[in-house]
């Protein structure tokens, strides 16, 4: 009987180690892949908007003056993804949460921080998703979650550029985790934390939160 118990214990330990090594291997592989294939923000349309808006947020504030817009007061001189204010200034149309985070990254790391911001957020996303699924549903659920996210070509392609997808998904996953924990424990502070993550995710990608 003791021999069987020891044998099962060794098998379980070996199984856990294999799962852990597999998870670490996937994370390391996908991290090197996305960091090695990032696209500078000035080479894309939406990523250029988010990158420049982040820089302007630090250097000039959330609004941007436009002499032609102030003089002629017509939308013909309004740039894509920008809105005109009553004072004939321009403000970003969307993604203010990412612009704020991008501005903070730009202050500390300059242009290189904006280059790597979205890939780093993607790496944090897959790690946070794996840990969330593991804590809530077990180690195999965490492994499956990690595989599905790492194999998502759409999420990977969006994350090599300065887009909103990785940050939105990260905030939504964290909000969902605390919401589920609230349902299990009925601790009121968890619903507050969950609401904060959901609220901030709406500043990153409003259309995404509406779809969910």
Which role does the model predict for each range below?
Residues 56-106:
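Interfacial juxtamembrane loops and adjacent helix segments
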Residues 169-170, 192-194, 207-212:
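Transmembrane-embedded, aromatic-rich helix segments that form part
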Residues 154-168, 207:
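Short acidic/glycine- and proline-prone juxtamembrane loop motifs at membrane-interface regions
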Residues 142-150, 177, 198-202:
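Short helix- or helix-capping micro-motifs
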Residues 134-137, 175-191, 201:
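Membrane-interface transmembrane helices that cradle and orient dolichyl/undecaprenyl
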Residues 28-30, 113-137, 170-178:
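Transmembrane-helix motifs of polytopic, lipid-linked glycan transferases
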Residues 85-124, 158-162:
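Loop-to-helix entry region of an early transmembrane alpha helix in multi-pass inner-membrane enzymes
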Residues 1-42:
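Start-transfer (signal-anchor) and selected internal transmembrane alpha helices
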């Amino acid at each position: 009987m003791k021999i069987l118990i020891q044998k099962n214990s060794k098998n379980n330990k070996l199984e856990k180690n294999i799962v852990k090594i597999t998870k670490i291997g996937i994370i390391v592989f996908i991290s090197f892949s996305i960091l090695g294939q990032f696209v500078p923000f000035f080479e894309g349309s939406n990523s250029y908007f988010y990158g420049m808006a982040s820089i302007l947020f630090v250097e000039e504030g959330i609004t941007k003056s436009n002499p032609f817009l102030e003089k002629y007061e017509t939308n013909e001189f309004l740039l894509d993804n920008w809105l005109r204010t009553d004072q004939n200034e321009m403000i970003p149309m969307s993604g203010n949460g990412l612009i704020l985070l991008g501005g903070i990254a730009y202050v500390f790391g300059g242009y290189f921080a904006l280059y790597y911001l979205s890939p780093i957020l993607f790496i944090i996303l897959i790690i946070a998703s794996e840990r969330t699924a593991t804590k809530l549903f077990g180690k195999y659920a965490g492994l499956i979650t990690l595989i599905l996210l790492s194999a998502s070509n759409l999420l990977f392609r969006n994350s090599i550029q300065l887009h909103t997808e990785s940050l939105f998904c990260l905030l939504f996953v964290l909000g969902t985790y605390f919401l589920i924990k609230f349902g299990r424990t009925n601790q009121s502070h968890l619903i507050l934390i969950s609401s904060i993550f959901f609220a901030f995710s709406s500043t990153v990608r409003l259309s995404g939160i509406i779809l969910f």
